[in-house]
Design a protein with these regions (language model features):
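Acidic/aromatic-lined carbohydrate-recognition and catalytic surfaces
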Residues: 3-189
Length: 190
């Protein structure tokens, strides 16, 4: 039988956004290295992450590489050498419209292997509301009356598929897709 190892921290934990306290993880580390801060914190919790994101202070993930505007590998190494454990949210349930997965959905539509990564609004609410002239289901009032929405209106993003149809997707962060402008000459070229 394998021995299970657990580690439970008993020291103080610093919580901060990566762009706070000077704007970068390097600046936060500089603060932690000051003599009066030495050994003050055992853990550092970055809210929510230091990944490449484009909205909502880090919850709209483009990809899971380090956002070099906030942190580099040398910063992570410095925390390790200081004996400070880094903690962060691993955000798997929010993806940016700029993520490779969403871009694949835009280019391949229903043929995208990532189509089920995103919630098709109409499939989700099918049988529980009425279709609007705009092409999305307006859920029955009793189903959404108690729901919290971050902004007025329904969180819907109409996504243009490769065949020209528009499909509504759940859009928690109220993102927008910036489609390239059409040149009328492109429509007549073969």
């Amino acid at each position: 039988m394998m021995e299970q190892k657990t580690s439970l921290s008993s020291g103080a934990m610093l919580n901060a956004y990566p762009d706070s306290i000077g704007g970068t993880l390097q600046n936060i580390i500089g603060l932690l290295q000051r003599p009066e801060m030495s050994d003050a914190f055992r853990d550092f919790y970055i809210l929510p992450s230091i990944f490449n994101t484009d909205l909502d202070r880090g919850f709209s993930v483009i990809d899971y590489s380090l956002n070099e505007n906030y942190a580099g590998q040398e910063d992570l190494d410095a925390l390790h050498h200081m004996g400070i454990t880094l903690k962060f949210d691993l955000i798997l349930n929010h993806a940016s419209v700029l993520s490779p997965q969403f871009q694949d959905l835009l280019s391949k539509g229903e043929a995208s292997p990532y189509k089920d990564f995103f919630i098709n609004w109409n499939k989700f609410w099918e049988g529980h509301g009425a279709m609007t002239p705009e092409g999305y289901i307006q859920p029955d009032d009793e189903l959404i009356r108690q729901m919290f929405f971050r902004k007025p209106g329904l969180p819907i993003l109409m996504v243009r598929m490769p065949d020209g149809s528009e499909v509504p997707y759940w859009n928690t962060f109220y993102q927008e897709i910036r489609y390239p402008e059409l040149n009328p000459l492109d429509l007549v070229r073969t």
